[in-house]
Amino acid sequence: LPSKFLIVGIVVIVVVIFIDLIAARKLWPGILTSIISIALIAVMIVGVLAINKVDNTVDKVTDKEREEKTEMVIAVLKDSQTEDISDLSELLIGYVNDDDIDSSKKIMSEIDNSVGGSANYNAFDDNFAMVDALYNQTIKAMVLNKANISVIEEGEGYEDFESKIKIIYSNDIVNYIKVVDKSQENNLDKFVVYISGIDTFGDVSVRSRSDVNILAVVDTKTKHIQLINTPRDYYVTHPKSNGVKDKLTHAGLYGVDNSIGALESLYDVKVNYYVRMNFSGFEQIIDAMGGIDVYSDKDFTVEPVKHYTVGENHLSGIEALAFARERHAFAAGDIQRGENQMKVVTAMINKLSSKEVLYNYSKILDGVAGAFQTDMSSEDIYSLVKNQLVDNTSYTIDSYTVTGEGKSCTTYSMPRTRAYVMEPNVNDVNHAKELINGVLNE
């Protein structure tokens, strides 16, 4: 809409130029007016291009349909003589009859086309039963969601699974999920955003585990943001689990809406929007901003990336990613990692509202496009940006991490083997609810 107004303005000024030239018979006053008008046209053309760039960037991350990719693979044992999909004609191939069944069937159809007929298949109830069958060579190959390789390695006795297999075929199965326009139902004065960081590089649309799970509770009137961090191993239920508890990080394997459902259930709160990015997008955004200044309350090193000192640290994208991912350097492990992740989010918010970024908007937009996904409408984004430009007051940002007790349990995603989980601390969860409601009701 702003672009249309500017284009109309350009047309009007062009008409004024011709009228002015005719009326003045090319005398100096007319020429001077024409020069001024041409200068105005140049400025407005730049404005059109800038706004179009904003429009294109915003549209790229706020599509009406969200693309979700599932990277499906065919794997065999490392020492197998099978090297290609065409070698599978005489072999028994395993697959799991689970949430990925539609994607598995598409891969099986590709196998059938490759071997020139119907191959031999055996269905399993879960990934671990299928892996056991591959190990004892009941089956010779398996159709698998690649994201589940890391899940399998979390199981006791399966830690070296990836080193025992080789992938002979891979294909991305693409689904399009309709994004509901929430611009009319949400209140931009107060809202909750789910920030999801998935554990992959490359294409942000690939479904994977969500290792960063932060709720940002925002009050745009009082300029207050409350960050609530939930550890990746929190033992929770989610919409897909039918009441069976699972790791919070595994909820992301079934889509971002599933992660949102888990947190809404845990904290009794409605999540209005989500922002989802992976490692690559995280690095791109921070580098586009010229880096961020992050406060560290610990002195530690992440080899070979950087040594972090107590106090302010200016970090590039890869340095910020290493800071946010590290947990082995701390006695508190994942809890400290969550605290550091919120420090990074705080630094990003502060940088995004700085004059340095506003003056460098073009480069920022180049870095943002395609780096993340969100269901926030372009109208809501424009409204928030406009309000921040009018009132450039800094936000007060508070953070809180819920904790729990570590234990070994079976989960919805890992029903046949035990894995480390964190049983939620009820008092912490209740305090987080109070903090959330404190912002929404203040």
Predicted regions and their residues:
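Membrane-water interface of alpha-helical transmembrane segments
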Residues: 3-6, 27-33
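Hydrophobic alpha-helical transmembrane segments in integral membrane proteins
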Residues: 46-64
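Non-catalytic, solvent-exposed segments at the cell envelope interface
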Residues: 59-70, 75-78, 84-442
